Structures are given as C-alpha cells and as structure tokens.
Amino acid sequence: LRLELRRTDPASINSLHRKAAAWYAEHAHPVEAIRHAQAAEDWRHASRMLTDSYVSLFLDGRRATVRGLLADFPPEAATTDPELAIALAGAGLFARGPEEVTSYIDLAERQAGMVPDERRPLFKLRVAYTKLWQAGRRGDLSEAREAMRAVEEAVAAQPADRLPQLAEHQVAALTTVGVVELWTGEVADAVRHLEEARELARRIERPYQEIGALAHLGVAARMNGETFANGLRLLEQAVALAEAHGWADDPIEGAPALAFLGSELVCLGRFEEAELHLVRAERALAREGTHLTELVVRYGWGMLRFGQGRLEDALAAFRQTERIRPLLSEDVIIDPRGRIVQVWARMGETAPARATLDELSPQERDSRFGRTVVAQILLAEDSPEQVVEVLAPVIEGASEVSWQVDPRMESIEALLYDAAARDELGEARAAEASLERVLELAESEGIILPFAFAPVQGLLKRHPRHGTAHAGLLSQILDVLAGSSPASRGEAAPLLDELSEAELRVVRYLPSNLKAPEIAAELFVSPNTVRTHLRHIYSKLDAHSRREAVDRARELGLLAPGRVR
C-alpha cells in the first residue's frame, strides 16, 4: 500500500504522516507519534513531542528507543533547538563521553532564550535534572546537592496542574542524589532520600525506578550496621522485581541490583551464587552503564577471587577497579588500594605491598581497616609482635575512623589477624580467645569471607570443637575454605505440569518477604489473582509451604540457587 501511495499520490504522504502523528499523540503513544512526525519531516513537532516524553521513556527502561529517535533527527537540529540539545545530553549520559554530554548542556543553556516562554519552566527543570544525573554518574556529592537544589527550585516554579506529572522526575532526582550520598559515605541522608524515592515509585506504579531505590537501600542497610539478613532481603526484592518485569539484565537498574546482591553473597561465602550474579551484571554493563556500577562489579570480582584463593585474578580485578577510580569523584568511598596491599601480602610479595601502602594517607593507614592492612604485611614479614601492637587500638575500640563499607568486616578481620599473630607467638590461649570472639561476631550474620583473607586455616582446624559454641559455623567455614560446593539433592524430577508465564512471575517473588497483596501490587494484578497463582504453583511444585516451593523452584532452575541451610 505504501508503494502504491508513493506511485499514485506522493504529495499526500507527509500529510498522512502528520495526521498519524496527531492521532498517536492524542492517544498517548509518543514513540509512534514521533516516528510519524519525523517521517513527515516535521522536525519542530517531532522535537516537542520527544522532549516532552524522553524522561518518561528513560524511566521505563527505554533508553535505546530514545537514542534511536534522536538519531533520526538531522545532525544540525540541536544547534537551533535547545530542548533537543538537552535531550541529547540526557541520552548521552550512559553512552557518550562526559565532554560530549557537557557540550550539549552548554549548547542548550546558551540557546535558552530560544525556548518559548510557556515551555521555559519545564526546560529549566530538564537542564537541572540532566546536571543532577551527570553529577550522579561521577559520584560528585557537592555537584549533586547543588543540582538537587536547582531541581527543587525548578519544580517549585512549575504550574500547579503540572506537578502530578512530575512525580516520576522527582523519584529519579531523589534516587540519584541518594545514590551519590550512599557511595560518598553520607548514609543517613542517602537512606532518607532513597526511602522517599521508593515510596513515591510504588505510589505512582513505577517499578523500574523502585528497583534502583530498593537495591541501594540494601547496600545502605549494611553500611548502617543493620543485619545482613535485612540487606539481603532488600536486594533479593530488587532482583525479584527486576526479574518479574524482564529488567534483570538492564544495565542501569538491573545490573546494580545483581552486582550488589552478588557482593553481599561473597561476604557470606556463597561464592557460586555470587559469581552467577556478577557474571550477569558484567554482561549487562557490556552494553552501557555507569562507571560507579562498573566499579562495584570489578570490586566484587576482586573480593570473590580473593575469597576463593585465586590471588592473581583478585589482583587483576582490583587493579581494574583502580583504573576506573579516577573517572569518579574523589568522594567515592570504594577504594581498592587496601585490598591490593592485602593480596600482595598474602602472595608473600611484601615489596609491592609496601609500595601500595605508601600511597595511602597517614589518616587512611591509621584507620581501622588501614591498621588491618598494615597487620597483614607485618604478618607476611614474620613480625607477629608488631601485628598485635598495630591491631590493639582496633580490637580495643580506640581506633574509630572507618575506611570500609562495613565496620563489622573491619572488626572480624582485625581479630583474625590478631589470632594468627598470637598463634605464631605460641600464645595458644590468646589465639583461641581471639578466634572464639571472631566466630561469635561472624555467626550472628553468617559472615565467612574474612576467614579466607587471613592465614588462619590451620588455626581453625585445630580449634577444639568441644570448646567452641560455634561448631556449626566453624565446619561451614572450613568447607568454604576447602572449596566445597553445596551438597546437591540430586537430579530434580521434571514438572508434569509446566508453570505458566504468569505463575513464573509470581515464583520470582517467593524468595522475598513480600506477602500476596504486596506481590500483587508489584505485578499490578489483584491479590486474589496472586493467591490463585500460589495455589497452582504449590500444586505443580508438590510443595506444602512457601519455603518448599522456593527450594523446589531452585532445584528446577526456575530461581537462582539459595543459601545452603
């Protein structure tokens, strides 16, 4: 029909495209409307529709669609259209270099006078949002807070009838500033902003945005000293939500959730599960993403390989983290240098270990984690007396400066090196006392990773089973250090009645603590529908409880493996 139209009435084609664009715009189909306007070469109309919808499309995970639409504009279009220029800047944050993004922002601001008066408040808001996202990409706290103030001022200047339409923009702003605050150590402010973002995202039914807030709240829980179980619950909810909507492999929201969950599982010694999540996060980031997420993924790989005793691989991963670090603000608290020192020391290479240690400031070396790093070098240099001396302020609580994401890890590592040093000094009772104390600290959370960092395997094997209150954890640690895998329950029998797509979506939420009405809210269905699906799921999986259903689903590969119980 199109070919026939071109042959018989080519003059009407653009008119028909304009009519189609108007119809799609009227019926809230912006992408189709923009494409028809572009086909009609009605660039002004296409630009207006795109600049009015690109943020919403971003927040639906449709960045590739936006970039495709932008690519269809003439190359020179942005030079006379500041609104299009700011859209190009926003689209480029995850795919272009920072210089190109900045040049588009500068171009938009220089041409701000060309924006019609009635559109200027919204234009100023989009400029402020783009600057906030740019600061978030770098992890720059001062720039992010300054941009957030500009966003708040621009929102206040909007007409009252437009404010409800800006809720999704507010979620993005709150999440962005919360993420920057989190990774620069301003955890209390981060939690406040991320909680606001999460609640607002749920209220306006924006699950894509909820994933990011949930995942970062999971990290914040650990930084706040909350239980690992609480942080793990939030991270599992974030991944379940991403899985349910097909966004688990999304580089902007899915990849961070997978990376954070993988890193959490590394700390618990669940290395095989952790690797699955880190692999998926890495694959997603191969397409696009942020340097901050890439930093977390590479650091997670370093911790995993260090825990597995693959020291060369750990060193390579931490060095990759070190190469990413200059692309981010100095405020970002993830710093691989301490771990690089530890890996070198564990390899017996004390010269490069000390060379890296010399890069740390006196304050960093005197921090709780810094003293632990120094202790590992001293232990490798056969100076156990100095190890005990260096660690005393950490163990006694006199050293309060924290240089790690989780202070509990600092305490556990310090006690482990103290135990190793006292063992070398022949102070058997003191070594056992330190080890018993560290087992008590670790057992409440199931923390295993630090036991793989310190040279304590022999000490753990000799630790008397009859004299410890933590025999179960001790056995589990030794299993992990020996490289054992979780015991398999054998080949899972296939399902006689396959789960439907709708039932599979519900299954992905079962590992979380969400109740049926909450799952229904996430999936935008009724609670009764979820309860019906649950009955069918239990029947098909031959399960009598939610826990049995989760275990059976994991056996069948419908869910990622869970923690060995």
Residue ranges: model-predicted function:
Residues 10, 14, 30, 43, ...:
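TPR-repeat structural position
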Residues 34, 54-55, 70-75, 105-117, ...:
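Amphipathic alpha-helical segments of tetratricopeptide repeats
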